[in-house]
UniProtKB/Swiss-Prot annotation:
It comes from Haemophilus influenzae (strain ATCC 51907 / DSM 11121 / KW20 / Rd). It comes from the Bacteria. This is Uncharacterized protein HI_1402.
């Protein structure tokens, strides 16, 4: 598949492979951050009881943005 993509884009196969590996590493970092934050929210949700705490967590989740 990468051979066909490289050919259609007019990019040397080796360059395309390097870019794929680089993007894969970048996505791994991003996905790790997102999964970690989701699990942190889930852990907090499982320990909350009063409705006020749940409302505060809901607001925090709605305001969450990926850290840049």
């Amino acid at each position: 598949m990468l051979t066909q993509i490289a050919r259609n884009r007019g990019v040397p196969f080796e360059i395309l492979v390097e870019k794929v590996i680089e993007k894969s590493a970048q996505f791994a970092v991003v996905i790790g951050i997102i999964i970690g934050q989701r699990q942190a929210f889930e852990d907090r949700l499982l320990t909350f009881n009063p409705p006020e705490e749940l409302t505060a967590l809901e607001q925090e989740i709605e305001q969450w943005q990926f850290p840049t």
